[in-house]
């Protein structure tokens, strides 16, 4: 469980996760696994669910430079997810999420230097160079399907488990998310998809070569809230983002967030 209290806005947020795991004891205890996750409560969430900036970094950039990059909203939520992993290298996942989304507003413009107060921005994402996207309270019901597969997976067989040795082939992934309207008051209606390929090559004395390429888009964008846009993991802080393979070090956090029919992006390390 997690408990969060805002001393300025006096909001109490509390939420918890329950995970249930099962294994195939007949053959091995690790490679074949099912996981059920139940979550619910009231929380504060970044608009980009990949959490491009952490709380400590955002606090430091705000206090020292007046740059409050983290943009968040409050939500009552409930979710259920199921994942199953097979020893063949196949992994599937299903999830359903309900959110009652509530705007959060700044309650202070405090910085260590008064001259930096003018840099403080609203707690809403800025698309492009200056297009601030506001939203009003609404509800959303989302269902998602994920599948990933790494062909040619090899293992070492032990008496009660298997140890994966990897594969010479990349990992392929697919995600489909549907925003369903008129269920539990849901106000969203969209369909989006993403296909990805990634790999980590050991070049021995030359080091390692990692890459990740994704293509996707919106098949239906009839009613898309800013929380459900396609976001990219940018970085505007004065320090490098931790995961080079899934982030863009010089990209503004929400500059290219979109509901386009098609997009493609990639990372190489």
Question: Could you describe each region identified by the protein language model?
Answer:
Residues 50-203:
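Transmembrane beta-strand segments of outer-membrane beta-barrel domains in Gram-negative
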Residues 35-56, 60-73, 133, 164, ...:
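C-terminal outer-membrane beta-barrel translocator/porin domains of Gram-negative envelope proteins
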Residues 3, 16-22, 40, 80-84, ...:
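Residues on the lipid-exposed face of transmembrane beta-strands in outer-membrane beta-barrel proteins
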Residues 17-21, 111-114, 184, 228-231:
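Charged/polar, low-hydrophobicity segments characteristic of intrinsically disordered regions
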Residues 11-30:
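Strand-loop-strand
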Residues 29-32, 165:
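Short helix-terminating capping/connector loops at secondary-structure junctions
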Residues 6-10, 23, 41-47, 83, ...:
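Structural signature of outer-membrane beta-barrel domains
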């Amino acid at each position: 469980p997690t408990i969060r209290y805002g001393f300025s806005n006096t909001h109490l947020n509390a939420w918890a996760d329950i995970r249930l795991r099962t294994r195939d004891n007949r053959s091995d205890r690790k490679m074949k696994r099912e996981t059920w996750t139940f979550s619910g409560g009231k929380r504060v969430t970044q608009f980009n669910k990949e959490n491009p900036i952490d709380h400590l970094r955002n606090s430091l950039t705000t206090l020292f430079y007046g740059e409050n990059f983290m943009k968040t909203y409050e939500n009552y939520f409930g979710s259920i997810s199921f994942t199953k992993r097979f020893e063949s290298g196949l992994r599937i996942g299903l999830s359903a999420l309900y959110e009652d989304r509530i705007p959060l507003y700044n309650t202070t413009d405090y910085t260590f230097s008064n001259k930096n107060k003018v840099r403080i921005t609203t707690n809403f994402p800025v698309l492009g160079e200056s297009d601030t996207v506001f939203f009003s309270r609404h509800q959303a019901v989302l269902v998602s399907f994920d599948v990933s597969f790494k062909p040619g997976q090899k293992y070492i067989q032990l008496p009660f488990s298997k140890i994966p040795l990897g594969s010479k082939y990349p990992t392929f992934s697919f995600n489909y998310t549907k925003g369903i309207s008129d269920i539990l008051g849901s106000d969203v209606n969209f369909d989006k998809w993403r296909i990805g390929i990634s790999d980590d090559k050991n070049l021995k004395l030359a080091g390692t070569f990692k890459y990740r390429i994704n293509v996707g888009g919106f098949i239906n964008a009839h009613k898309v809230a800013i929380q459900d846009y396609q976001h990219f993991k940018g970085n505007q802080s004065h320090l490098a983002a931790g995961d080079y393979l899934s982030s863009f070090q010089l990209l503004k956090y929400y500059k290219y967030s979109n509901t386009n029919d098609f997009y493609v992006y990639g990372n190489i390390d």
